[in-house]
């Protein structure tokens, strides 16, 4: 992905964000699923997914109830 926006360049320079974005280009996942798949703490993954969503690189596509909470599922936005 090529970009001239410095915010996007900085966001994509972070290794974990790049890995998350690559996974979400292939499949829809929740932060918990990404955490398990990438072997990273859930808090870190959730933070970076929110950052990517704030930049419009991923979007919320589905919510499902899970143990009294709501699980959010994201997918990469193709630009």
Each model region followed by its residue ranges:
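Short alpha-helical segments that sit at the start of domains
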Residues: 1-19
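Short, cationic-aromatic polyanion-contact patches
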Residues: 8-14, 30, 61-79
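A short linear hydrophobic-aromatic micro-motif
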Residues: 20, 59-61
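Short alpha-helical segment immediately N-terminal to, or the first helix within
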Residues: 22-24
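A short acidic, leucine-rich amphipathic alpha-helix
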Residues: 33-39, 52
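Glycine-centered, phosphate/nucleic-acid-interacting loop/turn motifs that mediate DNA/RNA or nucleotide
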Residues: 56
